[in-house]
């Protein structure tokens, strides 16, 4: 369940992600972002507007939001007041969520799939690292054995030289 009034950093992140994705997947927005240049601008603006609104709902001040998102207080105010297109759209998405008009289940499923994919990638990375560690351990053992042989030979040579 996505909280409309987040009380933790995790809940803020969830609300922020749902606001971004919920806004992006609205049909009118999909039309607006067909142009690749527009897409980059829109995604950034939507991300900032969604982050600002999620933090505002959690009780953050304008200054705290601006500091955390790396934007000016003026930019944050404009997004929160709906003076920017992105801010207006994100607020509309939030209101749709409140009224139960946004299919959050699909967005939640998408987010869960992304998280699962990231977890699988981490597990794969861990397995690769474990294999590399085993390979290095074996190599280390082989080198240690060779070093012991060299030490033995050196002792033999020194022993012969002393005679």
Curated annotation (Swiss-Prot):
InterPro entries: CHP03879_regulat_dom_put. It comes from the Archaea. NCBIfam families: near_KaiC_dom. This is Uncharacterized protein MJ1053.
